[in-house]
Amino acid sequence: MDQLTEDFEKSLFSDTKDVLGDYIEVGVDALINNDAIKEFPIIKTFAAVLKIGKNIHDRNLLKQTLTFINEFNKNNISVERLNEYKNQIENDSKKCEEELGRVLLLLNNFIDKEKSIMLSKLFKAYVKQEISWNEFGEYSEIINRLFIQDFSFLKEIYLGRVNDTTDRNDIYRVERLNSLGIIVMSFKSSRISTINGVMSNRQDSYLTMNNNGKKFMNIIMN
């Protein structure tokens, strides 16, 4: 098993994980030098790397990983389910590498910590057996492709506060969300307007969440 994946596994179930919340917002240098958490497996590994060079990608991955772990351990997984999953990956290195390795690859792509929190919520749903591994893969790709600036608009659609594109100047956001396969656009109206002598045709649509989008958002908003 890859060393980073192994340390990630140890950190995910570490007895000292509960102290992370107090330090998650501090800088990376403060994290790796803090006596209270510097022996945390994933921090210890990154500390060795970062002492050699100030690699911005490694620093970001450490922050995203700790954000993920902090969210994962917010006490809404039963001890039974948690231990069941822990035993599975401890006794199956291939499963551990496939699943935790995939999570690390995704975290390495993220810049916004909000995405790491979303991913952690999805992973918790998987551990609780609310979604399958295939669904986790599908939903995690949605997070990966999501523009974080579009999430507030997606939330408005999910909550029913926005149900069409009338008078909106950010249709591009609708098109981006539609490309993720989680909203439905249905024809509402079409009109022709003239601006500075140039004619344009505007088509407005009703907006709803499809079942896939509802399930995704039910997890993310929990």
What are these regions (language model features)?
Residues L104-N222:
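Long, helix-rich, hydrophobic modules that act as membrane-proximal anchors or helical bundle/coiled-coil regulators
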Residues D58-I131:
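Membrane-proximal, non-transmembrane interface segments of integral membrane proteins
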Residues T5-T67:
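Membrane-inserting effector segments that mediate pore formation, membrane fusion
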Residues P41, T45-A48, T67-N70, K86, ...:
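Short, surface-exposed, charged/polar-biased interaction segments
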